[in-house]
UniProtKB/Swiss-Prot annotation:
Sorted UniProt keywords: Cytoplasm, DNA-binding, Transcription, Transcription regulation
Highest taxon above the source species: Bacteria
Subcellular location: Cytoplasm
HAMAP family referenced in this protein's UniProt entry, alphabetically: Transcrip_reg_TACO1 (MF_00693), Transcrip_reg_TACO1_YeeN (MF_00918)
Name of this chain's protein: Probable transcriptional regulatory protein BCG9842_B4761
Disulfide pattern: none
GO molecular function, a single term: DNA binding
Biological classification of the source: Bacteria, Bacillati, Bacillota, Bacilli, Bacillales
GO biological process, one term: regulation of DNA-templated transcription
GO annotations of cellular component type: cytosol
A Pfam short name: Transcrip_reg
Length: 239
């Protein structure tokens, strides 16, 4: 699982060099979370998760404040949260999460990104059963044993705790996201390298080189769509 997260992290770091794109996606996600509940992260857990994620991407405060103020101002702009599932080359499994104000446009765009890159959209539930919703928290400056002790003392459960290069990665149930962070903050951890609610594949597949090239093009095409927030898959992209 650890190598899987590094796989995702490295890919995201490459793609998210386009800061304007990632900031725009966060702005939309923050607005939706703030609009659906209270615009206060203390009472709105969904908003708190998004803001914690935004910190790890260095999203500017101005973008965060603008999105929250837009929600406070009673903007009539509404977005639907939709999930698409599909297959890439060689049957690779893909989940695409979107926020859209035009369902027909988004469905057509996602379908085209699949079909133009040797993939195809599946029906609801066709691949999601092979993924687990997971909270992933990363930090530096502690060992895995130290993190385990901190979580045990706070009576917080984790699925797994792994050391990866200079970081420790904690994998937990989604509803433990805030509990894990709170326990670590209480032990002096001030910054997190990773703070995600993600879908992790239960097992990875390795593609032949030509299929992997095509698959990466498909993922890039999906991630470049304005309405797409997250793309999850079960392909080991290698180092």
């Amino acid at each position: 699982m650890g190598r899987k997260w590094n796989n995702i992290k490295d890919k995201k770091a490459s793609k998210d060099a386009n800061t304007s794109r990632i900031y725009a996606k966060f702005g939309r996600e923050i607005y939706v979370a703030a609009k659906q509940g209270e615009p206060d992260p203390e009472s709105n857990q969904a908003l708190r998760v998004v803001l914690e994620r935004a910190k790890t991407y260095n999203v500017p405060r101005t973008i965060i404040d603008r999105a929250v103020e837009k929600a406070k101002g009673g903007s009539e702009e509404n977005y639907d949260e939709l999930r698409y599932e599909g297959f890439g080359p060689n049957g690779a499994m893909v989940i695409v999460d979107t926020l859209t104000n035009n369902v027909n446009r988004t469905a057509a765009d996602v379908r085209a990104a699949f079909s133009k890159n040797s993939g195809n959209m599946g029906v609801n539930g066709s691949v999601a059963y092979m993924f687990d919703a997971t909270a992933v928290i990363g930090l530096e400056g502690k060992t895995s044993d130290e993190v385990l002790e901190i979580l045990m003392e706070a009576d917080v459960d984790a699925r797994d705790i792994l050391e990866e290069e200079d970081s420790v990665i904690v994998y937990a149930e989604p509803d433990q996201f805030h509990s894990v962070q709170s326990a670590l903050k209480g032990a002096g951890v001030e910054e997190f390298t990773v703070a995600e609610l993600t879908m992790l594949a239960q097992s990875d597949v390795t593609l032949p080189e030509d299929a992997q090239v095509q698959f990466e093009k498909m993922v890039d095409a999906l991630e470049d769509l304005e309405d797409v927030q997250q793309v999850y898959h079960n392909v080991d992209l290698g180092e």
